[in-house]
């Protein structure tokens, strides 16, 4: 795909990296490049979260209890605040026998790689497969858990 005045945004991803380029024709301060690592590892650990001030131990215990009770959880926050990392941390509390379906537009959760012995269906939305379609199909997969990642406006 061309990257020029007519196509001023280029988004590229690899298995563990997301790259976004914005052309100088629309980024008047000059070419903008954004890199985001998306490794298939759990970077958050309970002791690190409490020790680094990420959150209080009671918050972590509350979230773990919410997972045990199959509560719906929405994780919101600013860019770079650790939403995906918190989600990856919480997935360890999903029982192996319970089917999980993930729906993402950019593959970042890596559920199957981080939980190789768990029942999982990973879906990716695309130009020809919308979030609406993915959710409709997901329900036919009989999930115990549905994980929706962030959605970009183009989807």
Language-model features: locations:
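P-loop NTP-binding catalytic core
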Residues: 2-69, 114
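Conserved lysine of the Walker
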Residues: 83
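Short, glycine-/Ser/Thr-/acidic-enriched flexible segments
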Residues: 26, 40, 80, 152-153
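Switch/coupling sub-region of P-loop NTPases
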Residues: 70-79, 89-155
